[in-house]
């Protein structure tokens, strides 16, 4: 690998070329200033980063020793006292409110869906950024949200019976979201704008209007016969598209051809758990796509239905407001970027001792440099109109690590000439030590915090690893009913509201992991806004459009106001360990648990290691497609490792299960021409060996993280391919 030496850093030549020739021009930052500051950052803060990781291991060792002696805690007071004594559970300081300033309304005040997308994939990134607006008709027609009964099958061509059900659903949605003073939306015949009023002429000739006139936000086209009508509810917009020249509009009594919803209000462009970036070549791909998003020139050639076209970022949408002024609505989702956490290093840059630099330091420096194209002195202000950069920081353990991330951000701001606190922070509440010290974590970032989010997947992985020695864990499917998890979800909202996050920041909930099950999502995911979360994660633009309907039905600001008076969730519940009281499962139950875990692990790992795909839809044992990323992998691997450690299963049983399930995963991937089968070549399949490592060596992985094994095995495969 060719390297360029700068201020004691050995930088991969390809990364150096990208930074100097592509990322820096237009930012006002010159190469010497950048690399000098980057070197200072690495050499000043690298040792502190490593010390924090040592502290994680020391605390884990103390916990392991306690559990080996006591088992799962019964006397919670004694357990709590031990956690305080070792510095795991910290004293809580006085009440305070966060003071984060210059936050865009998409984060501060608008409640709505949030996408998380692998930024390494330009097509996915563009689709997500453009998912600010989505067709409700398409989302309903193309998913199981509308049942395929009574002749309403999806089929190949357009099915008018299905279309009629879609239209009826959308009209009922309009009745609930923007009711008319008289009549229903299904009675509408035509529309006009008279003065500042939307007039809806009904089939019987009577005139109606929205019951609440403030809900009419604007229109496009001729006021006597508008082409689009904009309505607003709970800060979210609905666009009714009127076009009688289209097949749908022609068949519609009112000429409505579509109902478009403001959908993914925010999107996390992910450099972490949903991607596989193990070296400089990969990191340049990640950073180049982020650069295209910040400069607004990211493009991707797409072929759909035999037609080729170029996908670009959508422009803003212009309408006429009721008072005649121009109403401009953002065309794109507000983008956040998720950097990696404090754990991993990357060979893209070496320090003066020849050691790999902490990847989190590199991500902070490079993603912020690139964000100058949006928020710098000459920035476009096309993403953040408030001049902020939004960085999601994952996998932090406790307030000291949050404070360290703030220190990194402050150093980067100073290096790049950004105002203090321009780099905002999203805190993933996905590690147990962060959960139990959440108030102090928020305090450490009180001038930067723009979201706290419960990542229940990683959080479950950490729960298992933290208490690995306490005993065999309950089955994975039973985790969601365990006392700690509901307490954790409520505690996050309670503490966030106590710290004054309303109006400043998002309180977020986790991912709906079944992208094909949209009817179930429509039924169930409304619990997130009802729980006081003003955002929640969805797996696709379509899911964002459907989940957006929940924020029309639930006014999250009102929910949050009502929750402020409730008693905070109990710490003792959060600290309860999900160990099986009587692990008396049948052999069949144990084997089914192993099969399901093994299938998820193999289905994900084989694509990660062999093809560098960091986010996959993997069929589970019941053939339901589940979105798998490193967080779901962490749970499955740690769960199997726990049962192995406590003798519920044997190593031979795990190997047999993995080999048997590998053949099933091979079959599920039979249609992929790039796929390398695992069955029959278990010793030589690097992916299969990686999957085994994750389980058989699961106890020794730092905090149960999967990155060290995945990175090592992917690099091994790339070296083999390059040889």
From Swiss-Prot:
What assembly does the database describe for this protein? Monomer.
The record's NCBIfam families line, in alphabetical order, gives:
malate_syn_G (TIGR01345), PRK02999.1 (NF002825)
> What gene is this protein a product of?
glcB
Record-given protein name: Malate synthase G
A Pfam family name for this chain? MS_TIM-barrel
Alphabetized GO MF terms? magnesium ion binding; malate synthase activity
CDD domains assigned to the protein according to its UniProt record, in alphabetical order:
malate_synt_G
The family annotation for this protein states:
Belongs to the malate synthase family. GlcB subfamily.
């Amino acid at each position: 690998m060719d390297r360029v030496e700068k201020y004691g850093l050995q930088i991969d030549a390809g990364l150096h070329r990208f930074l100097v020739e592509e990322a820096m021009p237009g930012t006002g930052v010159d190469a010497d200033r950048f690399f000098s500051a980057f070197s200072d950052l690495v050499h000043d803060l690298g040792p502190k980063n490593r010390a924090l990781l040592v502290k994680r291991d020391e605390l884990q060792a103390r916990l392991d020793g306690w559990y080996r002696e006591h088992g799962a805690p019964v006397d919670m007071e004694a357990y709590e006292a031990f956690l305080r004594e070792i510095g795991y559970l910290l004293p809580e300081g006085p009440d305070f409110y966060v003071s984060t300033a210059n936050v865009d309304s998409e984060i501060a005040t608008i409640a709505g869906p949030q996408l998380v997308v692998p930024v390494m994939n330009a097509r996915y990134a563009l689709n997500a950024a453009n998912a600010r607006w989505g067709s409700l008709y398409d989302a309903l027609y193309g998913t199981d949200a509308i049942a395929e009964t009574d002749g309403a099958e999806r089929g190949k061509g357009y099915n008018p019976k299905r279309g009629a059900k879609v239209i009826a659903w959308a009209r009922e949605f309009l009745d609930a979201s923007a009711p008319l003073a008289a009549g229903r939306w299904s009675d509408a015949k035509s529309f006009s704008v008279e003065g500042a009023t939307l007039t809806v002429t009904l089939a019987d000739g009577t005139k109606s209007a929205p019951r609440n006139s403030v809900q009419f936000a604007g229109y496009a086209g001729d006021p006597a016969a508008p082409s689009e009508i904009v309505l607003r509810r709970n800060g979210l917009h609905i666009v009714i598209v009127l076009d009688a020249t289209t097949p749908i509009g022609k068949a519609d009594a009112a000429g409505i051809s579509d109902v478009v919803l403001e959908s993914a209000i925010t999107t996390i462009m992910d450099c972490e758990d949903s991607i596989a970036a193990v070296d400089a070549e990969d990191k340049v791909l990640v950073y180049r796509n982020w650069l295209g998003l910040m400069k607004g020139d990211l493009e991707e050639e797409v072929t759909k239905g035999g037609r080729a076209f170029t996908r670009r970022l959508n422009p803003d949408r212009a309408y006429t407001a009721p008072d005649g002024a121009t109403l401009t609505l953002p065309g794109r989702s507000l983008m956040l970027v998720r950097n990696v956490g404090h754990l991993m290093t990357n060979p893209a840059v070496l320090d003066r001792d020849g050691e790999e630099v902490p990847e989190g330091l590199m991500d902070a420096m490079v993603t912020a440099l690139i964000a100058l194209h949006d928020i710098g002195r000459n920035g476009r202000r096309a993403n953040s109109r408030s001049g902020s950069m939004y960085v999601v920081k994952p996998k932090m353990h406790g307030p000291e690590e949050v404070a360290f991330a703030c220190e990194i951000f402050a150093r980067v701001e100073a290096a790049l000439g950004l105002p203090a606190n321009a780099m905002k922070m999203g805190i993933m509440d996905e590690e147990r030590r962060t959960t139990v010290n959440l108030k102090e974590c928020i305090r450490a970032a009180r001038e930067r915090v723009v979201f706290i989010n419960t990542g229940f997947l990683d959080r479950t992985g950490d729960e298992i690893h933290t208490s690995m020695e306490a005993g065999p864990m309950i089955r994975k499917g039973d985790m969601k009913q365990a006392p700690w998890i509901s307490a954790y979800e409520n505690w996050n909202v309670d503490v966030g509201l106590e710290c004054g996050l309303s109006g400043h920041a998002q309180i977020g909930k986790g991912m709906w992991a079944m992208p094909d099950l949209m009817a179930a999502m429509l039924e169930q995911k409304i619990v997130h806004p009802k729980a006081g979360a003003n955002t929640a994660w969805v797996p696709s633009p379509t899911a964002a459009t459907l989940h957006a309907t929940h924020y029309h039905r639930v006014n999250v600001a009102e929910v949050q106001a009502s929750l402020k008076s409730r008693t905070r969730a109990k710490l003792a519940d959060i600290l309860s360990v999900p160990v099986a009281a009587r692990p008396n499962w049948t052999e069949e139950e144990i084997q089914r648990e192993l099969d399901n875990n093994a299938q998820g692990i193999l289905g994900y790992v084989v694509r990660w290691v062999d093809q560098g795909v960091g986010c996959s839809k993997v069929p589970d044992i019941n053939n339901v497609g589940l979105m798998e990323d490193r967080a779901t992998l962490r749970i499955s691997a740690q769960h199997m490792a726990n049962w192995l450690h406590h003798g519920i299963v044997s190593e031979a049983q795990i190997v047999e299960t993995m080999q048997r399930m590998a053949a099933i995963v091979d079959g599920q991937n039979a249609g992929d021409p790039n796929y390398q089968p695992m069955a029959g070549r278990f010793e030589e399949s690097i992916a299969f060996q990686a999957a085994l490592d994750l389980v058989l060596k699961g106890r020794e992985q730092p905090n149960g993280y999967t990155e060290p094994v995945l990175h090592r095995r992917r690099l091994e495969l790339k070296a083999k391919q390059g040889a």
